[in-house]
Amino acid sequence: MDLGSLISETRNPDTLDLDNLSTLDMVTKLNQQDTTVAGAVSRTLPQVAEAVDSAAATLLAGGRLIYIGAGTSGRLGVLDASECPPTFGIPHGVVIGLIAGGPAALVTSVEGAEDDEGLGISDLQAQNLSANDMVIGLAASGRTPYAIGALRYARQLGCRTAAISCNPHSPLALEAEIAISPLVGPEALTGSTRLKSGTAQKLVLNMISTGAMIKIGKVYQNLMVDMRASNVKLVDRARRMVCEATGCEVAQAESALQQAQYEVKTAILMILTDLTAEQAGQRLAMHGGFLRAALQGHSQQPQAHK
């Protein structure tokens, strides 16, 4: 492939004078470029929605969601995966981020790692990849061998697959069932895909992980009710979520949370149904962990739930 022909590698005619601008004019021009990213992502929403549904189906069936990429793309996948356990209360290892070169590549460049298709395959094999899992390949260019090899292997195993790249009809996209390609255009700094391309990938990853977690019952209304209250800030947030969802006072929220071992969903259900912590936990289990379903039809639901 002629790398110079990739949109992400071409020069941006609007930023040819970056080195000759005042600092304010320079950052203004960079910001103007960034404002185009959300629009580019919006044009991929049908494909993003498809990826959300696929990821949710994978997780509900007991499979894992695995991001794999190199450089900035790989780091973004690791970042998104690492945020899922504290935000949504899922175990570590349910959403996984893999980067070419391993953990060391998060802070330093590992030369040549992205050019090895076999390395992408072996990294997935090390995770005992199975057909129950979903693999999302990440590469701004869409031609990174590490990610392409990984997606090809995942598809051969029968995994659900998706690709996120910022060039149209890329080799990576052709390996995936779902191709998400936000076309952000040439970078402000030629070839520096950590800029608009990285921002676009982050926005898409945000939607995929958040959307999938909503669809598997980790969110009630717009509250992350499976959050782990692991520090002072999050304990306070847990109290506020219980108060906001039920209309109760802080003291009642704190009492319910203590009885529920700081499981927010359980505490909310206890207050709205007068169930004990054990009964509320059982009722949630009967409804697959979906709080709205557990509350459905109960006479004590507040107006917001009707």
UniProtKB/Swiss-Prot annotation:
Group of enzyme by EC: lyase
Keyword Lyase applies: yes
Gene3D superfamilies found in the cross-reference section: 1.10.8.1080, Glucose-6-phosphate isomerase like protein, domain 1
Matches recorded under PROSITE patterns: GCKR (PS01272), SIS (PS51464)
GO molecular function: carbohydrate derivative binding; carbon-oxygen lyase activity; ether hydrolase activity
Pathway annotation from the record: Amino-sugar metabolism; 1,6-anhydro-N-acetylmuramate degradation; Amino-sugar metabolism; N-acetylmuramate degradation; Cell wall biogenesis; peptidoglycan recycling
Keyword Lyase: yes
Pfam families given in the database record: GKRP-like_C, GKRP_SIS_N
UniProt keyword terms in alphabetical order: Carbohydrate metabolism, Lyase
More info: A lyase-type mechanism (elimination/hydration) is suggested for the cleavage of the lactyl ether bond of MurNAc 6-phosphate, with the formation of an alpha,beta-unsaturated aldehyde intermediate with (E)-stereochemistry, followed by the syn addition of water to give product.
UniProt name for this protein: N-acetylmuramic acid 6-phosphate etherase
Organism encoding this protein: Erwinia tasmaniensis (strain DSM 17950 / CFBP 7177 / CIP 109463 / NCPPB 4357 / Et1/99)
